[in-house]
Amino acid sequence: MALSFSKYHGLGNDFILVDNRQSTEPCLTPDQAQQLCDRHFGIGADGVIFALPGQGGTDYTMRIFNSDGSEPEMCGNGIRCLAKFLADLEGVEEKTYRIHTLAGVITPQLLADGQVKVDMGEPQLLAELIPTTLAPAGEKVVDLPLAVAGQTWAVTCVSMGNPHCLTFVDDVDSLNLTEIGPLFEHHPQFSQRTNTEFIQVLGSDRLKMRVWERGAGITLACGTGACATVVAAVLTGRGDRRCTVELPGGNLEIEWSAQDNRLYMTGPAQRVFSGQAEI
């Protein structure tokens, strides 16, 4: 069959967007999505995002298959791309959507300057909600030791609807993420695997981060990871509640509100091209 698609990216974190509004189930299997994400034999992407009908009073539902065929709960850069995709389909420039995801209802807002601001919800900090066994149920994981690749890392864990393990380092550019990333992702302390963020503090309001994403590997940006980065910086006394997070693909503005405990992410989403692919 011929699949119509559009390609979008958020700071280089790129996705295949599919208009799936006529069905409540994705029109592709995880295996087909994995084939399309292949950068040599397919379209090439970090994941496939499906725009499905809304549930429970929401405007739309988002489902995602990663480049390895796995399905994450949510994706911060992905939901910005989805919001831009929906706005392009509807022919509007400024709009707020309520999107049902496996991590709950997320609210992206298209701004007049072309940026997308997203209410990412509240972070979950208790060990069983990450989930991880690094601390007993009911306790937080903040700067606790984790042995990986022959050394001990001080890690903080945050769930943004998906699991994040975060560690602060002196120089993020010196790390071999291809080598150590999978060891964090598949560490037995994380029953559902984990995303891993390596963070360098540039200032109290500026953080530099590289990410190894669960199911996707090294990516140029991670929205939920940027949110978790600011949470970890605040919890460990390394950063402010409002920070610029520098990623290989560009910057995200993150605020962890003291008023409502919610995280707000602002960043770009851009259409690259549209086409058809044979499945």
Swiss-Prot record:
Keywords in alphabetical order, please. Amino-acid biosynthesis, Cytoplasm, Isomerase, Lysine biosynthesis
Function, as annotated: Catalyzes the stereoinversion of LL-2,6-diaminopimelate (L,L-DAP) to meso-diaminopimelate (meso-DAP), a precursor of L-lysine and an essential component of the bacterial peptidoglycan.
Its subunit composition reads: Homodimer.
**Cellular component, GO annotation:** cytosol
What are the BP-aspect GO terms? lysine biosynthetic process via diaminopimelate
The record's NCBIfam families line, in alphabetical order, gives:
DapF (TIGR00652)
SUPFAM superfamilies named in the record: Diaminopimelate epimerase-like
State what protein this is by name. Diaminopimelate epimerase
Species this chain originates from:
Synechocystis sp. (strain ATCC 27184 / PCC 6803 / Kazusa)
Q: What class of enzyme is it?
A: isomerase
Q: List the catalytic activities from the record.
A: (2S,6S)-2,6-diaminopimelate = meso-2,6-diaminopimelate
